[in-house]
Amino acid sequence: PVVNGYVQFDKTYYVKNKSKAALMDSLRNYVQRELVDGEEQLSQARITEVSPDSGIIAASIEEYMYFKRTNWQIHRVRFYYQLVFHVADGQFDVTMRRLHYRYDPEVTAGEFNDDRRAENWITDEAALTKNGTKLARVSGKFRSFTIDRKNEIFKGAALATGAVVKRKVTRVVEVE
């Protein structure tokens, strides 16, 4: 979704019987352990603000996003984004914003040193084919991997706090 011209993902989670302080502690620990100190994180990943009074946790994250990884080939970009949690008693909102990508110039041939903003790569206008039915080859890859990563982060935050995460149920019907 585009908010004020920028790609931004938002979600609200409800956690029964958890205080604001307990949620703040759980989320801060999750962000530190999984996003700042995680195995794919790079040097700029850090928690930028923790404000217990206003219930805000903010983090600037830099990590590798791998499109393909084999013994002979690595296709990855540096993925930058900002996470902001607004915490209250029994609930929290999570926002992922300021998304952009950058290829490593030392491992990527060609002119890929530019900063690629999500607004130019993963919106419907950029990532879908002209008829709007399929993902485009290059920008569609950015879109699907970004949304998968967003879902993983949001689900991890929900599980860290004990929020109920709805699972998709698939029903298989056999017909003779």
Question: Which residues does each predicted region cover?
Answer:
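Ser/Thr-rich, low-complexity intrinsically disordered terminal regions
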Residues: 1-176
